[in-house]
Each structure stands twice: as C-alpha cells, then as structure tokens.
C-alpha cells in the first residue's frame, strides 16, 4: 500500500490537501535576501507529491538543482482541529521554482513531499520550541529550532482556515529553517544515491533515499 493510500485509509480522506508556508523562519528569510513577510505566504502541493518514510525521492530528468527542506508538519483532524505533528520534507526543484517566478511547479513533482510515519498527538507535544534538522548523507545542513518561526502553529492554522475549510488528513507544512542547499556556498544539490534525514525533537526521523 502506498503512502497516499495509507494516509487516505487512516484519515478517511480522498486526497489530502498539502498547504505550505514560505519564508516562515526568520533566519531563512534572511539567507534568501527577502524581507520578513507581514502575513503567511501560502502555496500548495497536490497529493501526487506525498510519499512515506523509506520511500524514494525521484529526481525528474533535466530539471537542474533540487534540494530538501526540513519542515514541521501539522496534521489536521476532525472539524479542522490539530490532530498531531510529524516530520516532512518540502523537496524543491530550484531552477523551476525561481525560473517560473512562482513555486507550484518547482515543488509539485511526484515524490516531492515525504512525510513521516509517526504522528505525535497534539496533546503530547508543544511545537513552539523544537529542534529541527536536515542531514544529507549524515552531514547536518539545517539545524534550528521552531522558536525561530515568524508565524506560529496556531496562527497558521487560523490563517489557512480563513481560506479553506480544513478537513481530516490535510497537512500544513510550517516552513523551513536556514541552511537549505541552494543558499549555501558552494550550493548543495541532491544526487542519486543520497540519503536525506529530517529529524524533529519529540517526533523522530524521516529518512528517504534519492533516486533518478
């Protein structure tokens, strides 16, 4: 059973909606050269991007630079409530993302949203100050804390709820901290055979191998 099928079965949803938030860590907004956003910057991924822990991230042919983003994911439960939290990876094809001037294509390829298998119930975890890391082949690229978020989890859920009625199984990816490959010097891109790990304190590790 695929990760999408397991997700649908678990939450009774047809296709989960994946709402993402851009530039939501202060240091990441700084490394990108942009100003701090005055409101959450929302974009989305379709369910075709969803894969699970241990699944492969597949690099599209002739797409250029691709890198990973460590993210805390909010899992929505019944009636728009917060069911829990898990690890996620907002995989991004930067040449497409920046070349298009918008983010949908660069972040929308198949397998570009790995999500962890462990969901920690909301009542058991305070998301306001958790260590969040990305490791590539064992080397730490991102190492920050969710206390650097510009807009916290309650603010994001309330803001997104003004746009759509959130349903069970929907996901909100809350943004990524500084250290992503495209803004490093020299740049760090994913290559076939790489192993990406996203680890969040109190949740666990999401691990995926990269293939072409």
Regions found by a protein language model. Give the residues of each.
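Extended, compositionally biased flexible segments
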Residues: 1-69
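Catalytic-pocket segment enriched in acidic/His residues
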Residues: 2-12, 28, 34, 86, ...
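Structural motif
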Residues: 16-19, 40-42, 48-49, 56, ...
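Short beta-strand-to-turn element immediately C-terminal to the catalytic PLP-Schiff-base lysine
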Residues: 21, 31, 44, 53, ...
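Short secondary-structure boundary segments
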Residues: 23, 89, 176
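Residue-level marker of positions within ordered structural domains that often coincide
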Residues: 24, 48, 79, 120, ...
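Non-heme Fe(II) oxygenase catalytic core, chiefly the N-lobe of the double-stranded beta-helix
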Residues: 55-83, 87-94
């Amino acid at each position: 059973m695929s990760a999408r099928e397991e997700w649908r079965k678990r939450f009774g949803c047809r296709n989960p909606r994946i709402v993402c938030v851009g530039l939501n860590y202060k240091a990441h907004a700084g490394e990108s050269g942009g100003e701090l956003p005055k409101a959450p910057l929302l974009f989305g991924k379709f369910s075709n991007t969803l894969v699970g822990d241990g699944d492969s991230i597949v690099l599209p042919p002739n797409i250029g630079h691709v890198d990973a983003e460590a993210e805390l994911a909010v899992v929505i439960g019944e009636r728009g409530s917060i069911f829990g939290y898990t690890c996620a990876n907002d995989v991004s094809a930067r040449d497409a993302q920046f070349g298009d001037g918008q983010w949908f294509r660069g972040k929308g390829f198949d397998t570009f949203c790995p999500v962890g298998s462990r969901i920690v119930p909301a009542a058991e975890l305070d998301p306001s100050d958790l260590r969040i890391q990305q490791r590539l082949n064992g080397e730490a690229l991102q190492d920050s804390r969710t206390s650097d978020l510009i807009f916290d989890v309650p603010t994001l859920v309330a803001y997104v709820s003004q746009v759509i009625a959130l349903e069970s199984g929907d996901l909100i990816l809350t943004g990524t901290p500084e250290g992503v490959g495209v803004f490093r010097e020299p740049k760090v891109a994913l290559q076939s055979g790489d192993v990406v790990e996203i680890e969040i304190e109190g949740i666990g590790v999401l691990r995926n191998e990269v293939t072409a």
